[in-house]
C-alpha cells in the first residue's frame, strides 16, 4: 500500500520529515509532499522529498508516500521515507519525480535550513 508520509515520520537513514503541508493533516500530523524538507543524519544535511504520488494531491503538490526518495548528500536511492500510519493511503502505488523548478526551490530552502542547523539551529535528529 502507498501509505501517506507525515511531518515527523522517519527515514531509512534515521532522518525525519521536518516540515509539511499547511492545510492537510492525518492523525494530527501534517501530510508530507514533494519538495518538503527532510533532515538526514547520515550526510548531516537537510534534503527534500524528490518524489510524490500523482494520485494523491494537496494544494497542487503530490503527497509523499512510503518508499519515496529523499534528495540529500547521500547516494541516490539510499534515503527513503517511512510511513508511520496505516489509516490513509493513496488510491494507487504510483510515483512521479519532482519537477525541475520545484526541485530548484526545494534545494535552496534545504541549503538555507542546513546552514541554520550548522550555526546551532534546531536539532531534528532528536525528534
Predicted segments with their positions:
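Intrinsically disordered, low-complexity proline/glycine-rich segments
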Residues: 2-127
Amino acid at each position: 500500500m502507498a501509505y501517506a508520509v507525515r511531518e515527523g515520520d522517519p527515514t531509512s537513514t534515521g532522518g525525519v520529515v521536518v516540515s509539511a503541508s499547511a492545510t492537510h493533516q492525518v492523525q494530527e500530523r501534517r501530510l508530507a509532499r514533494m519538495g518538503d524538507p527532510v533532515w538526514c543524519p547520515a550526510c548531516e544535511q537537510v534534503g527534500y522529498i524528490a518524489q510524490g504520488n500523482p494520485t494523491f494531491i494537496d494544494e497542487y503538490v503530490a503527497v509523499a508516500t512510503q518508499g519515496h526518495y529523499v534528495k540529500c548528500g547521500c547516494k541516490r536511492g539510499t534515503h527513503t521515507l517511512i510511513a508511520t500510519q496505516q489509516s490513509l493511503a493513496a488510491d494507487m502505488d504510483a510515483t512521479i519525480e519532482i519537477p525541475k523548478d520545484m526541485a530548484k526551490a526545494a534545494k535552496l530552502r534545504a541549503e538555507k535550513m542546513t546552514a541554520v542547523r550548522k550555526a546551532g539551529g534546531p536539532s531534528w535528529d532528536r525528534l
